[in-house]
Amino acid sequence: MTVTPSGSNGAGSAAPEGRKLLRLEVRNAQTPIERKPPWIKTRARMGPEYKELKSLVKREGLHTVCEEAGCPNIFECWEDREATFLIGGEQCTRRCDFCQIDTGKPSELDRDEPRRVAESVQAMGLRYSTVTGVARDDLPDGGAWLYAETVREIKRLNPNTGVELLIPDFNGDPALLAQVFESRPEVLAHNVETVPRIFKRIRPAFRYERSLAVLTAARDDNLVTKSNLILGMGETPDEVRTALVDLHEAGCDIITITQYLRPSPRHHPVERWVKPEEFVEFAQFAEGLGFAGVLSGPLVRSSYRAGRLYAQAARLKPAATPPVS
């Protein structure tokens, strides 16, 4: 998944509670937090829908990734009545070098979480909801039931709300993937995040080809598919274009392309700041390949304008039906 904050104040090189720093984290921390270029900025546009949701979330004690990850796009997404929820707990059984979610032993599975998320979607009056979560390799089903049940509960309470489900790879297990696909989210997302050459370094518990296979399986089940690429972690422009070709050939319908923002000193250093005009060029390349939906920019995140991208892709994929607005 893609969970990166809007930036870091430079703190955070200390080990997370309950474990020591990994050797990789110690090495990462030797590089100071990078100064962001002037184009990495966002304006707070607090419209009436945003203000209403902000008040409701605070009053009801609801939790969204939008707020907790400090997403720079919260103002736009909430104005569109879109939000993202994290399921499965606060500890992930895998560690990706860009992700702010901590690695450790997860808490027990909370079987009531799907209902609570669905009620939050209902309370917020969302038009489109994105659900993401941690990897749960500690569970026999890898958390497949939790992901599928959350979609079912959201749809039961909110029949006119679109649901985008961003999943781990479930180790490529066809039965577990089928269990998740049967919940029929409007969009099935699985993020590749980076290019083959540096994939193992950045995402050691995942496999590039396996991630592509997850998207192919979802495509074959007639789901609208989506993925994400994070730039600035050491890839070259040619490698980005090759990854886009791979994703399109694997059956990916929607692609988002983003700039890596380092969550803390113990995370992978920013190798370079990709210029806005480069993001435009990558978007044009992706559109030329035939992706049904493309968003590319320094502050784009994988769930940014998710409902709009789905509606755009659905028009080009007749089996998909956009949610009622």
Curated annotation (Swiss-Prot):
Gene Ontology molecular-function annotations: 4 iron, 4 sulfur cluster binding; lipoate synthase activity; metal ion binding
Swiss-Prot/TrEMBL cofactor(s): [4Fe-4S] cluster
GO cellular component terms, A-Z: cytoplasm
Family: Belongs to the radical SAM superfamily. Lipoyl synthase family.
Protein name: Lipoyl synthase
Cofactor: how and how many bound: Binds 2 [4Fe-4S] clusters per subunit. One cluster is coordinated with 3 cysteines and an exchangeable S-adenosyl-L-methionine.
CDD domains for the chain: Radical_SAM (cd01335)
Pfam family, one: LIAS_N
Positions contributing to [4Fe-4S] cluster 1 binding: 66, 71, 77, 303
Source organism of this protein record: Mycobacterium sp. (strain KMS)
InterPro entries xref list: Aldolase_TIM, Elp3/MiaA/NifB-like_rSAM, LIAS_N, Lipoyl_synth, rSAM
SMART domains, per database record: Elp3
Residue stretches making up the Radical SAM core domain: 78-292
Transmembrane segments annotated in the record for this chain: none
Reaction catalysis annotation: [[Fe-S] cluster scaffold protein carrying a second [4Fe-4S](2+) cluster] + N(6)-octanoyl-L-lysyl-[protein] + 2 oxidized [2Fe-2S]-[ferredoxin] + 2 S-adenosyl-L-methionine + 4 H(+) = [[Fe-S] cluster scaffold protein] + N(6)-[(R)-dihydrolipoyl]-L-lysyl-[protein] + 4 Fe(3+) + 2 hydrogen sulfide + 2 5'-deoxyadenosine + 2 L-methionine + 2 reduced [2Fe-2S]-[ferredoxin]
Compartments reported by the entry: Cytoplasm
EC number: 2.8.1.8
UniProt pathway: Protein modification; protein lipoylation via endogenous pathway; protein N(6)-(lipoyl)lysine from octanoyl-[acyl-carrier-protein]: step 2/2
Keywords in alphabetical order: 4Fe-4S, Cytoplasm, Iron, Iron-sulfur, Metal-binding, S-adenosyl-L-methionine, Transferase
Signal peptide annotation: none
Annotated [4Fe-4S] cluster 2 binding sites: 92, 96, 99
Keyword S-adenosyl-L-methionine: yes
